[in-house]
């Protein structure tokens, strides 16, 4: 059985728009509030998923960076990643020496000025060997695109 988790962005929380949407439409999606820097948040995520396998990590912005870093460290524990405007342009992130094979859907907004596709996509292509890319007519928040994604299939 798979476990789906939502990883919120840096300045967001489980009270953010996407988290509230998941609670309303897909209450099985697990989430928690992450605090601190990237390494602290990754420790919190590791504690949260201790003993779990077949993880479906849905990461928004900084949460997408968290999901990517977790998958690089534990690819065998990840079933799928859904990266929503991930912060792969964050200065500390470096793609791994060898691409990981976790199936990954990368969704970006064409008008995103926080995590612009021209900076994020090359990082994703250097990280994942099984990458599907969608560039939507949207901005960083992906408010128009997010609710109409194929969540019933992405979360199984």
Regions found by a protein language model. Give the residues of each.
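Active-site catalytic motif of lipid deacylating hydrolases and related acyltransferases
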Residues: 2-52
